[in-house]
Structure formats: C-alpha cells, structure tokens
Amino acid sequence: MTAPFRLHAPFAPAGDQPRAITELSSGLHRGDRIQTLLGVTGSGKTMTMANVIADWGRPTLVLSHNKTLAAQLYGELKSFFPNNAVEYFISYYDYYQPEAYVPSSDTYIEKDASINEDIDRLRLRATSSLMERDDVVIVSTVSAIYGLGDPVQYRERMVALSRGQQIARDDILRALVGIQYLRNDVAFERGTFRVRGDTVEILPAYEEQAVRIELWGDEIERISKIDPVTGETIAALERMAIYPAKHFITNRPTIERASMAIRDELATRLAELRMAGKLLEAQRLEQRTQFDLEMLMEIGTCAGIENYSRHISGREAGERPACLLDYFPDDYLVVVDESHVTLPQIRAMYNGDRARKLTLVDYGFRLPSALDNRPLVFDEFMSLVPRLVNVSATPGELELQLSEGVVVEQVIRPTGLLDPVLEVRPVKGQVDDLLHEIRARERRGERVLVTTLTKRMSEDLTDYLQQMGVRVRYMHSDIDAIERMEIVRGLRLGEFDVLVGINLLREGLDMPEVSLVAILDADQEGFLRSDRSLIQTIGRAARNLHGMAILYGDRITGSMQRAIDETTRRRTIQREHNEAHGIVPRGVTKSVDEVRFITRVADARVEREGEAPAPRRLASESAPRSREELETLVGELEIAMREAAVALDFEAAARLRDQLFEVRTALGQAPSEARGNAQAPKRPPGSAPQRRAGGGRRGR
C-alpha cells in the first residue's frame, strides 16, 4: 500500500477553517457516522474538505450534483493532493437516449448512446486505483449509485505479473484476452496488446502509458513502463497488475448459466401475459428475448445486455446491483458537496428509472428482471456509507435530520470578507434603478448577476440593456454545462459585464469579480425565491470586497425575512471577528490564467491543451460571403463540432452539425453529401414502430 495523503496547500487554514477541520476530524475519529458542515460561500469549504480527508487518511468519495461542479472539485482536489490518486468518475456517455415506450402514441424509442473513450479510461482508472492504493479521492456525480461490474470478479480477474515470474508467453496472452483485452499488432490503442517475439506490450484500458513485458523462455526478465507512441522506456518496474478492460466481465459458463435463467423467467412471464389476455405483448416479448438469447449464445453479448444483468451476475430478484461504492474498503469516507441538492437528487434517481422501465415491462418490451438494472434506492445508498460529511451553505431538512441537528459552522472567511450588504427596494422603477447600479459597477470593472422569474422577462431585460449599451449576456435553460462554463469564463474575463438568467449558478461556482446580485420580483414566493435559494443566490456576490445584493419587492415575504436574518447573523459574526482580531477584509483576485484553469471543464479536456476556434456567425446571420470564406467556415464548424462531441456536449455538436449543413448548402453541396450514408437503426424483433424523440439527454 502507498503512503497516506500528503496535502499541498499554498496557505494555512484561516478564519473558521481550523475549528471546522478540528470538529469534523474529531467527529470522524469519535465514530460520528453523519456530520454536516454549514460553510458560507467563499469560506474555503474545499480546503476544509481536503484537510479532513488528509487527516482521515482513507479512500474518500466526493459526490457532486452535476458535471460542472464535479470538474471544478476534481481540479481543486488534484492541486491539493498532487502526489495522491485523485480520480474522476462520471457518466461516460457523450449522448444518452434511454430505451422507452410511449403507450399513448404507440411509440417505441430504442436506446441510443455514444461512449466517450476518455471518460471510460478515467472511470477504469478510478476503480483500479481503489484496488491498488489507500490514498485515493474519487470525485463523482450520481453515476456512483448506478450499476457497475462486481468488484470481487474485477479483482480476481486481475493479471499479476512480476519480474522473475515463471509463466509462458501464451499464458499471458490468454489471460489478457480473458479480461477483454484485444490483440492488435498494428494499431496500439487503449485496451489492446501486441506481441513481438518474446516481448508483449500492453496498453491498459485505464492508463496513458503502456507496459512492456520481456521474457526469457518462460521467465519474465524485465517489466518496463513505456511511451506507447515512441516506445521509449520511462521506468523499470518490479511488478505490474493489469486490471480488466471493462467493468463488466463475462465468460462462457456465465453466459450459459444466465441464458438458462432468462429462459425460465421468459416462460413464467409469457404464461402471465397470456393468462391476462395480453397476446400482442406476449408475442413481442418472446420474439425479442429469443433474439437476445441467440445473440448471447453466439457472440456473448446483445443489444441491451444490461437488462439481463441480474441473471448474468447471479443476483436474486430485487437485490441491488453492485456500484462504485462496493469498490471502496469498509472504512472509507463520503463527502457530499452541495448536499441540499445532491441528496434529494440521489433519492429521486430510483423512482424515475423505475417508472420508465415499468412501462417497458408492462407492454412486453422487457422481462421483469430488467427492473433490477437500476440505481440504488436512498436507503441502500445510506446503508453502504460508513461515514458521511454533508457540505452546504444552506443545509436542508434531510441533512439536519441525518446529523441529528448538529452542524459545524464555517462562517468566517479566511479573507475577512463579510456577507454581501442587503437592500430591499420597490419594484416600481426597478429596471432604471438596476441600470444605474450596473453603470457604477462598469466604472469599477466589476460584474453583475441579474436573476428574474421568467424567460420572457430575462429576454426583454437583456434586449433593453443591450439597447442601453450594456455588455450583457443571457443564460437560458437550453445552454448545457460546457457552454455555461464558457459564459462564466467570459463574464470573469470581462468579455461582458452583466449576466441575466432565471436560475443563475446558485451553487458552487467561484466568481469573485461579481460585486452585485440583483434579484427581481424577490417577493414572489416559490422554489426560486425560497429562503435557501435566496441565500445561495446572494452568495454569488460574497467573494467580492464590495459585495451587495438588491432584492426588488414591494413586500417582505417569509422567505425574504429568513434570508435577510441569516445573512445579517453571518455578517454580525464576521464583523465582530474582524474587529476582535484587527482583520482588514481583502478581495479575491485571480489572474487570467487562473480563471481559464478554474473554468475549464475537466470532463474530457482535462489533459488536452488549447481549444477549438469558436465558429463565426451562422450563415443565416452573416452578410454574403465569398466561396473561400464559406469553405473556411466549414472547416471551423467541423473542428468545433468534433470538440463539442469530445467535451460531452452532444446538443451543441448537433447544432453545429445543422449549421454545417446550412453552410454546405450555401456552397452548393447536397445535404446528403454532408450527412453521409447513415441508415436508420433497425427495429428489434417484435417492436412497435419507432419514432426518434427529438434530442436525447446527456449522460448523468
């Protein structure tokens, strides 16, 4: 096993951080199973988390509710633990359209997905690190509670090689094939190996560097880590463990056993359907399942094989699937970031998944065992968590209940900054008043966030501000995580001064340039104007020395009053601490390079340099162009489209594709030339007519 965590921080804990670190660490060593950290915006919660993780010294899972914040956490924790294994585990889908059936229109939607190879590598690296070391931090989304291969099989099928070991070359090759590695002597890619005489070179599915095994007869003479492109030796190794190329591993006996169980379940289910008079459903189910069984027996897999995972893994009906949490040792730690959002998200996953699959089962598209290919229910998740720290600026009732009302507060910031000044102003004349405040921030080089209640109001306000010469952008619900990060970067770098939206970045993102948050119609009770939402939104200005929040409303609602009272309480604590210790608040400043690093999305570009050039205006928006300009634009759009796909951004890639068709049409190329010869996927046997739903959904 490797050495424990070594924390590298450019500064010592300050403000409330030392007390919070001590209380949380003491609670862990005391045996407190669930704790809650209330950390105000800008108080350095990630720094506190890193210190607690280092003190505990055991593998840790950090959960976030979306990929954007997970990417930010991954980058921050990687900088805190540069010599330890900080890994990233999110959905590996670039694009994911789940299988579904809509009875009202008799529409069957076949599963459609595109897997990102880089993310798949990071997922495999995360689990292999857990098998090898204790100093592991894995940053994950809700993907952590979805089905994964059995960790016992994953460990048992590992191929262990050491210098001086007696083993025949062909035995090594057979072992590699048995864990899903492919021999490819031409293209040396991830998850492949190649053979040159008594030398075997392997590129593990979870690594970027390859391994060279040199034999002398039936003895391993040398093991080296090499560059897969140049073949140059990087380091000599005494031993090497090669873990499977996939999390789900099957063999012939397993497939045969699973096929028998599937046939038994099929016979039982067909009898039930026929007895209920559902003859069409019975015929459909029999045709589809028999087709899948034939594919399983012939090639070892089939479309939708995950729906038979219960039989393949040998689980009982209703038994939960294995997931990432099963790969951790017994004494690991779970940290739930923005727990007021993440915990309810975990709780909601099971019901949504079951509702969709239940329709497939009822109408004969799937066997009932498909329901057991599912995420964990909340109680199962909690039963697998030995120690839990919830982290939020606004803990919800669930966290308070789980931690029995005991909360560790981190209210005082290391910078001495106070919570934003709050003002309540009337609705009448709010836009003119807002414009006056924006002008003042423009002169100081500061930024403004404006949040409204409706899309129409956001659009109208953005148009008005643009007419008044304000550099403003509008963030709407159609913008995905990657574009959102690009907009945040533009705001922080001063490409524009004002960002307008409905539910603007309430949680997590670091924007110290924002000095004013304006909340329009703050007196309208509802989810977007609850006390927790208001506190989170107000917190977007908490990292600026001149932080201020204006709540526009003609009355003070209960939610507004609670948000005002809590902000006032925090400001009082912070001010008294500063006065007692002679602290002068100082603002947070970031260089351009730091802003670019923090706002890059780590999903697939974590180790790539540079970005694709942004495409110019759409053909429909531009003035007439020369043929040369249009051909240049085609190249730009193609590059941007590929980059969007690599960055887990299928929706943007589709929009860029449509723009590409438009420009090619202007060039006189037929759309079919651009689209290629793609054919519609074939319907599974016995399925209803398929109609592709408009737009899939991004992987979790």
Swiss-Prot record:
Q: Name one Pfam family in it.
A: ResIII
All copies of domain UVR, residue ranges: 631-666
* UniProt-recorded Gene Ontology molecular function terms: ATP binding; ATP hydrolysis activity; DNA binding; excinuclease ABC activity; helicase activity
Residue numbers spanned by region Disordered: 608-627, 667-700
Biological process GO annotation list?
nucleotide-excision repair; SOS response
Residues annotated for ATP binding in this entry: G39, V40, T41, G42, S43, G44, K45, T46
- The main location class comes to cytoplasm
Q: Which PROSITE patterns match?
A: HELICASE_ATP_BIND_1 (PS51192), HELICASE_CTER (PS51194), UVR (PS50151)
Q: Which intervals hold domain Helicase C-terminal?
A: 430-596
Q: List keywords of the entry alphabetically.
A: ATP-binding, Cytoplasm, DNA damage, DNA excision, DNA repair, Excision nuclease, Helicase, Hydrolase, Nucleotide-binding, SOS response
Q: Where in the cell is it found?
A: Cytoplasm
Any one GO CC term of this protein is: cytoplasm
Q: Does the keyword Membrane apply?
A: no
Question: Boundaries of each Helicase ATP-binding domain copy?
Answer: 26-183
User: Which segment of this protein is annotated as the motif Beta-hairpin?
Assistant: 92-115
For whether the record's keyword set contains Mitochondrion, the answer is no
Q: Which SMART domains match?
A: DEXDc (SM00487), HELICc (SM00490)
InterPro entries registered for this protein in UniProt: Helicase/UvrB_N, Helicase_ATP-bd, Helicase_C-like, P-loop_NTPase, UVR_dom, UVR_dom_sf, UvrB, UvrB_inter
Q: Of which family is this protein a member?
A: Belongs to the UvrB family.
What note about domains is in the entry?
The beta-hairpin motif is involved in DNA binding.
The record's section on NCBIfam families has: PRK05298.1 (NF003673), uvrb (TIGR00631)
Q: What does this protein do?
A: The UvrABC repair system catalyzes the recognition and processing of DNA lesions. A damage recognition complex composed of 2 UvrA and 2 UvrB subunits scans DNA for abnormalities. Upon binding of the UvrA(2)B(2) complex to a putative damaged site, the DNA wraps around one UvrB monomer. DNA wrap is dependent on ATP binding by UvrB and probably causes local melting of the DNA helix, facilitating insertion of UvrB beta-hairpin between the DNA strands. Then UvrB probes one DNA strand for the presence of a lesion.
HAMAP family named in the record: UvrB (MF_00204)
Q: How does it assemble?
A: Forms a heterotetramer with UvrA during the search for lesions. Interacts with UvrC in an incision complex.
**What protein is this chain from?**
UvrABC system protein B
Name the species this protein comes from. Gemmatimonas aurantiaca (strain DSM 14586 / JCM 11422 / NBRC 100505 / T-27)
Q: State the taxonomy lineage.
A: Bacteria, Pseudomonadati, Gemmatimonadota, Gemmatimonadia, Gemmatimonadales
What gene codes for this chain? uvrB
